[in-house]
Structures are given as C-alpha cells and as structure tokens.
C-alpha cells in the first residue's frame, strides 16, 4: 500500500507502508508541530503566489482580447495560466486543507477526484510549456508549414493535444487511490494508494517523473538546440547569400526587416533558454527527492529538508507567468494598466515584435509577406 503522508505533495507520489502489519505503521498523528506549521505556511505562500501571478496575467490577456483577436502567442500563455491555476486550485489548495487536518476528510469519490485533478494540473502545466516550445520551433525552423496551419484561435491543435494527454495520463489516479483504513481495525481512513506488486510504487513514481519532468524537459531542450542552430544559420550568411542575397532559395527581405526578424528570433531563443533553466531548477529538487524516497529504503523521509522539498511541486507554476510577461511587451503593458501604473504609449512602429517570434503563425506570416 502506498502511504499518504503530509510530506508528499502531491500525495500521488508518496512511499509505501508495510501492508497488513499494524505494528509497522506510524501512529495516527506523529507530526512535528513546528514542521507542520512550516508546511502550512509554505503551502499558503505557494497558493497565493500561483493564484495571484497567473490570475493577473490571465486578466491582462482578457483585457487585451476584448480589444481584438488574441495573438497566437497569447493563446498558449492563456492556456498555460489556466493549467497553472488548476495546479493552485486542485493541487495546492486541497493539499493545504489536507495538511491542516492531517487525514483526508471526505468520501471516497472526493478522494479519487482530488488525486486525479492533482495530476491533471501537473501534466497540463508541463505539457503546455512543451506545446508552446514546439510551436516556436515550428515557427522558426518550418515557417511555411506553420503558415499553412494559421493561428490566433482560442484553441488550437497543440493546446488540445496538451490538455488531452493531461486528462488521459492522469486516469490511473482514479484506480490507485481510495479511502482506506490506515491501521488494522483502527477505523481511521485516509486517501491512500495500493499496488498489487511490491515494485508497483517504484514503477509508478518513476513513470510520473519521466512523463511530467524528464520527457518534457528533453523535448524543450531539443527544440532549444534546433532553434539556436536555425538562428545561427540565419545570422551567419553563407557564400550564396553573400554573392546573390539568397539562402536556401528564399528571397532576402530589406535590411530593416531582416534585422527585425533576427532580433525577434534571438528574443525567442533567450526566452526559451530561460524557460528550460527555470523548468529544470523548479522541478528537479521535487522529483529527485521523490525518486530517492522510493528507491532508497534508508532515505531520510521525515527530515525537515526532505519534507519541505516535497512541497515544491508547484514552484514552476509561480514562475511561468512572469517569464512570459517579461518577454512580452503587450502583456507587460496590460499588467501595468491592471496595477494602475500608466506608461507613456509607444508608437506601434517602435514596439517590440515579440508576437512574431513567439508563435508559428504570426512569425511565418511576416516571413512570407516580405
């Protein structure tokens, strides 16, 4: 049986207690009171940070959408905010209530629903970043293909695929978790998971680490390498370009247009690099601790550093909105308006062209119209 303790967030990634042996089970409540208060304070801070950050950015996007059609970049950012808000509402908030009461207070159906939605938020947040990066790669490396698909709708294929995979990959939670007795005949119930085989826990936690963290990180990093290579190739003219102003059969645009496209591509590369670095830094501690806890029987599972690191599954959801807002002048200006910080309007001709670099459709539209 997979033991659900206050030291695992989400509790889908906890470690097992010895099944069928009440003497090996922990007491009904053996928490360190000080550590429990620190957990509650940390979870409360994370919840406020995730909800406020993503709520502000989503509000800025809604304000901008009322004045016209969303740019393709805004579609991805909007859905990433929704995914991160799902993390706050369905992962952090239930975990906060759970830690406050120590045991899960609710019927079996609610237990299964909470466990399912906790994983949906984790998957959706990771896969939306991957979908956005894949779209940026297509914009820069395959602009004609991107142009044929178009963009700007509130839903597009990468967004739908990201949500669909998140909903499907979270389904095992409904069958693994249930309200179960925490001891032999004690009558106390908690939302625990059980596996038919002793190796089931290790396999499941490793699978989640691969699908939520490792696979998306490798996909994002691979796109980053290809984007950097394309930018380097476009900025370093070959012999044919120097002789006739063409490369790869494409007609060269004006020097001003070429400089703007190059700057937009470079900005995309910088943003993607920041995303990869922050993504790894935020997720790595959590999953390293989770894997350590299930693969090493002697892991210090109850130590304060171990416990607190397991609370940081939602850290990436705090940083996502600010990364994209800092690289998007349009979102930044809307945020200033929301926060009552007026700024002198910049002429359209002088505004940064971040939307053209960040998504496939808008980048390719400019590229093909030159």
From Swiss-Prot:
Membrane topology: Multi-pass membrane protein
Protein's cellular compartments: Cell membrane
Domain of life: Eukaryota
Stretches of the chain found on the membrane's Cytoplasmic side: 63-76, 135-158, 220-270, 328-370
UniProt xrefs under Pfam families: 7tm_1
Keywords, comma-separated and alphabetical: Cell membrane, G-protein coupled receptor, Glycoprotein, Lipoprotein, Membrane, Palmitate, Receptor, Transducer, Transmembrane, Transmembrane helix
Polar residues bias: start-end ranges: 356-370
InterPro entries (UniProt xref): GPCR_Rhodpsn (IPR000276), GPCR_Rhodpsn_7TM (IPR017452), Vasoprsn_rcpt (IPR001817), Vprsn_rcpt_V2 (IPR000161)
Single Gene Ontology MF annotation: vasopressin receptor activity
A GO CC term assigned to this protein in UniProt: plasma membrane
Residues in compartment: Extracellular: 1-37, 98-112, 180-199, 293-307
Region (Disordered): 1-28, 347-370
GO BP field: cellular response to hormone stimulus; G protein-coupled receptor signaling pathway; positive regulation of gene expression; positive regulation of vasoconstriction; regulation of systemic arterial blood pressure by vasopressin
Transmembrane spans: 38-62, 77-97, 113-134, 159-179, 200-219, 271-292, 308-327
Glycosylation sites: 21
Lipid moiety-binding residues (S-palmitoyl cysteine): 340-341
Function: Receptor for arginine vasopressin. The activity of this receptor is mediated by G proteins which activate adenylate cyclase. Involved in renal water reabsorption.
Family named by the database record: Belongs to the G-protein coupled receptor 1 family. Vasopressin/oxytocin receptor subfamily.
Record's subunit section: Interacts with ARRDC4. Identified in a complex containing at least ARRDC4, V2R and HGS. Interacts with TMEM147.
Protein name: Vasopressin V2 receptor
Organism: Sus scrofa (Pig)
């Amino acid at each position: 049986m997979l033991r659900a303790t206050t030291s695992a967030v989400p509790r889908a990634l906890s470690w097992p207690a010895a099944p069928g042996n009440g003497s090996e089970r922990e007491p009904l409540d053996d928490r360190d009171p000080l550590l429990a208060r620190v957990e509650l304070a940390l979870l409360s801070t994370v919840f406020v940070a995730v909800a406020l950050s993503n709520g502000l950015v989503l509000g800025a996007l809604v304000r901008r959408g009322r004045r016209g059609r969303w740019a393709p970049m805004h579609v991805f950012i909007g859905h990433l905010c929704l995914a991160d808000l799902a993390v706050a509402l369905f992962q952090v908030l239930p975990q906060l209530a759970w830690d406050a009461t120590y045991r899960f207070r609710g019927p079996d159906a609610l237990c299964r629903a909470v466990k399912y939605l906790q994983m949906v938020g984790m998957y959706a947040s990771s896969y939306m970043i991957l979908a956005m990066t894949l779209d940026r790669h297509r914009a820069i490396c395959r602009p004609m293909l991107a142009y044929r698909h178009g963009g700007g709708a509130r839903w597009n294929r990468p967004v739908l695929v990201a949500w669909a995979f998140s909903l499907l990959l979270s389904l095992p939670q409904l069958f693994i978790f249930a309200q179960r007795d925490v001891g032999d005949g004690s009558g106390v119930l908690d939302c625990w998971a059980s596996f038919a085989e002793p190796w089931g826990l290790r396999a499941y936690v490793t699978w989640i680490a691969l699908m939520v963290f490792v696979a998306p990180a490798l996909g994002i990093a691979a796109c980053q390498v290809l984007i950097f290579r394309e930018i380097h190739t476009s900025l370093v003219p070959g012999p044919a370009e120097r002789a006739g102003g063409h490369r790869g059969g494409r007609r060269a645009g004006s020097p001003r247009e070429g400089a703007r496209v190059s700057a937009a591509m470079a900005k995309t590369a910088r943003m993607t690099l920041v995303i990869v670095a922050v993504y790894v830094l935020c997720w790595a501690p959590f999953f390293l601790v989770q894997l350590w806890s299930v693969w090493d029987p002697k892991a210090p599972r109850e130590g304060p550093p171990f416990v607190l690191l397991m609370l940081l599954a939602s850290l990436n959801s705090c940083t996502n909105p600010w990364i994209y807002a800092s690289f998007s002048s349009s979102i930044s200006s809307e945020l200033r308006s929301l926060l009552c910080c007026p700024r002198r309007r910049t002429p359209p001709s002088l505004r940064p062209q971040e939307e053209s670099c960040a998504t496939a459709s808008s980048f390719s539209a400019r590229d093909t119209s030159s």
